[in-house]
Amino acid sequence: MFSKYIFYPIKIHHKYHTIPMMNSPFLLENQTEYKKWRDNKLAQYPASKDKILVKLNDSNLNDNSINLLRDSINKYNFGIYEFNSKLTNEYLKKFCSKLKLLQSVSNLLADENDISNITNQNTERKQSSGIEYIPYTNKQLNWHTDGYYYPIDSAVKSFLLHCEHPAKSGGENILLDHEIMYIFLRDHNPDYIKILMQNDIMEIPGNKNIKGSGSIKGPVFYIDEKNFLNMRFTSRQQNIIWQKSDMIKKIKDYIFSFIAEDNYYTFNILLRENQGYIANNVLHKRKEYVDGDKKRLLKRLRFSERVE
């Protein structure tokens, strides 16, 4: 019997504390600031992934191109790009540094550059360890934010996903800005947000397959030290402990109903060779895929900063 999931513990250096700015639109008492922010956010839709795609030249990565990508990320919390040739791992990190992404987050399957090769390793990994980690298979990957199993003071704030080789079929990535999810929850019932910001609303239990792995409790939504909204979420039903109450059941039902099908605010992205996206850790999922003679290979880099 294989364990279906593995979490990667990281050292906790300090307890997380933050005091949101008094005029934050994400504080429930700030209705005026919220309405202004909300109206501006929703005015960016509808949007087409083709219209926000930024084409880049690896030999001339100029400020104008980077600013176009940053502008998209500021609007939708992600941006899509396409390079004109294959990139090295070193160049991927250099590219991210242009967006001020410098503090990469490693894990046990990352290389010396903190880059993870997201490809179907299902057979090899089962044979070697008896553990199946869904991102490293060709299976569907359900809605989540990256690193939701990390403590907040070690959070993943952004990530890059770069396609080196696509699948023969399938493998689309579907993205949903977590700020859109926040808007719909708050507009439906502000108490939902109050509850989702509680520090013990969602718990990830320790993994018995990893020595020293302890449980992690935290909020679903939280405001960080720079006054940005972040989200910890997974649609998984196993190995997740939510607080139990009638209100929390209603909240979960609302969230799962909202993400059950693609909607006006979701982006369906099938990455081609040399394409990728950089995201401020939005909600995302992946469809099942089938490999051809050459395996689907995406490079992933995670960061503790976000694109600003």
Language model segments and positions:
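Short amphipathic alpha-helical segments
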Residues: S65, L87-Y91, F95, H188, ...
